[in-house]
Amino acid sequence: MEAIINFFTGTLNTVAWLYIFLPCTIVGGLYLTIRNRGIQFTRFGYAMKNTVGKMFQKQEAGAGAVTPLQAVTTALAATVGTGNIVGTSQAIALGGYGAVFWLWLAALLVMMIKYSEVTLSIQYRERDAKGDWVGGPMYYVKNGLGKHWQWVGILFCVFAAIASFGIGNMSQVNSIVGSLNDAIDAFIPAAEGERKLLNFVFGVAIAALIGVILFGGIKRIGAVAEKLVPVMSVLYIIFALVVIFGHAGNIGPAFGKIFATAFTPKALGGAASGIALKQTIVWGLRRSAFSNEAGLGSAAIAHAAADTKSPVQQGLYGIFEVFADTIVICTLTALTIICSGVDITFGHKVGSELITAAFATMFGQKFASVFVALALMLFAFTTILGWSLYGSRCVQYLFGLKVSKIYQVLFIIVVVVGAVASLDVVWDIADTFNGLMAIPNFIALFALSGVVAKLTKEYFFDKNKLAK
């Protein structure tokens, strides 16, 4: 049994993430960028104008759908999470400052991957028995590639449903509970017995909240995400900017460190001199992937519910999503850490302590501890919301609506388990299945890349183009 577990958490995890996901992400990003004429660069202004530029306009959705904004905030709910804070901190600690450069580079390329996922999701979506729009990799396989490719969609759903319990549930709940404990300990340290009881109470409360929202369907999830995601993101951005400009003299040198060590990490000297170029590249690329989820196909499930007639129009939200998640929030986390001048033990894994120490340079230790704890808590909560939808849709595709209701009940129960149990092995296995999701998704993306290119050409480049 131990050998099987080691295979899933070690060998298979390495193969899935390092030897399949990362190469496919870079090659796929380059390929789709070329096929679609680099619209993430040439049409970036148009994309921002027609996504973030419309956020404050009143939008209403038709039956069985959500507004385009609710769709993207639901996707961002699952995407903007602990990876933006802890993941970016780890990229710097394990890959050096130069890892931030590779994080940026990957984000620019994977914008076209997420654009393609969302575009295909709208193009090949369908109505379910309730009349709701459903889509995602399993549907663009089914309706775009045909019955002989059904196994690809089934594989995706199996991998995603399993991953939803770990990456999208237990690990996030554990992060919330840990954050709440940190916030409480900043004022009144709790005894071990009291902590266990508190964790159980927290777990039940979180499960109840998730249940109320989840059983309200996609419209309720979208309504909550639409309000929560912008608020938590803006607050985090504001406090990060306060720290960065509070150390304004370090902004230039911070960028200097990032670019100077992107190709020669040993240039920093000292503890960072032990970091190899491979580590810098791999950790930058890997944390970028963990942060924005481009290539996993998960966000396409949320976007499929958007009330829109244009696949490309919704696809532009995919570009915005990566920009907001990685280029904006991850960059601010990185600059907050580097500009603050906090000590970094290179080559060692870190949690939230780096960003907490950075905030403490401006706001003091107690406030920083509470703020980071609350930020992690909100980010983790919205991640659970997004993944509850993803897992539910995958189970629905495999077994039907009735069984998806059973999945939802099980998902809520697992929330409580994640709050009180230490299940590192389960999380590691789920992380492997998270990476495996990319394999069937990339098969479909490459096979249907011509469809995306055709839709993009019709929208942007034909004489009677749809883009105004």
Question: What is each model feature region?
Answer:
Residues 1-82, 92-99, 110, 416, ...:
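N-terminal alpha-helical transmembrane segments of multi-pass membrane transport
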Residues 4-5, 35-40, 83-88, 166-176, ...:
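Transmembrane helix-loop junctions in multi-pass membrane proteins
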Residues 22-27, 153-158, 184-218, 234-236, ...:
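Transmembrane alpha-helical segments of multi-pass small-molecule transport proteins
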Residues 24-31, 35, 39-48, 173-180, ...:
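Membrane-interface loop-to-helix entry segments
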Residues 32-33, 106-131, 138, 142-174, ...:
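Helix-loop-helix module between adjacent transmembrane segments
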Residues 38-66, 90-100, 112-146, 343-363, ...:
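Flexible loop linkers connecting adjacent transmembrane helices
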Residues 59-94, 120-138, 142-144, 155-161, ...:
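Alpha-helical membrane segments and immediately flanking helix-loop junctions
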Residues 115-125, 129, 239-257, 265-272, ...:
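Extracellular/periplasmic helix-exit of transmembrane alpha-helices
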